């Protein structure tokens, strides 16, 4: 199984333990049912969650949710991590040192000369002449640029000169040439320690000791390893927090999508009901309506094909009182009743709303008859 999915599941379970109300959301119903079907018991929702179920659910403020999520996340993973930085120095910014031409053709004479330069460089190093040692190792590298130990030796001098970035460049080159040599890892680990790169330092020093145990490298590994472990634990902590935050965000997105869908359904249902309310009138007005309304009005509202071409129809429908009456269920029920049987109009003689609409229609159509 994908380890990331396992971590996400672990983070979700932890979140559920901290806040069981998460399991009582509608989208988590399937999980509750499964747990109960297996004989398990879902913890009761918090009082807050129960009260929300008994009242109208308030829509979440997305901005507030985002602010809460951001508040949970520090500005950086190490913002609240305290590490002793004794011995850490500012990085060196010198131009890259000479590395020699790795494609150069090397003769035996050049190799002998390079070896002589190396011996002289080691003597200068033992005498404390560090810059002279650097220059001599550089001469040796230019003569034999494919010898890993020359880069490792020069890196050791750069570390003594407190130029960790230069040392790292030399060690990288040495490892490219011979990845099984312990010396480049040892000096690169020491360089990373000078820069406060605790995890990188621990990795390189551990590998150096694995390839060829060295007491000096082992002693420094014991110093940096606790700091590297502390950083790793801190990172895992915030990875779990990020995973929990991602789960919360996904739940929030599902919740918002469901609310949008439900709102769209409600709006569609309202439109359907509105269309049915103002739909076609059954049977038209057979035989004509009293008050000189022309007979045979085969439809109104959403299905008014018989009235579509009537002169003055737009004028009638633009009359606010007519529109208001057509939105009154009581008036429309009476209107349909009279449409089916004009004799029933007598029942509504005392209803001013119904008679007002009939009078307006009668006056309009009567005037154009």
Curated annotation (Swiss-Prot):
GO biological process, alphabetically ordered: chaperone cofactor-dependent protein refolding
Biased composition regions of type Gly residues, renumbered to the chain: 281-302
TPR-type repeats, residues: 114-147, 149-181, 183-215
Biased composition (Basic and acidic residues): 49-73, 256-272
Keywords from the named record: Acetylation, Chaperone, Cytoplasm, Phosphoprotein, Repeat, TPR repeat
Modified residues annotated as N6-acetyllysine in this record: 353, 360
InterPro entries the record matches: Hip_N, STI1/HOP_DP, STI1_HS-bd, TPR-like_helical_dom_sf, TPR_rpt
Name recorded for this polypeptide: Hsc70-interacting protein
Organism: Pongo abelii
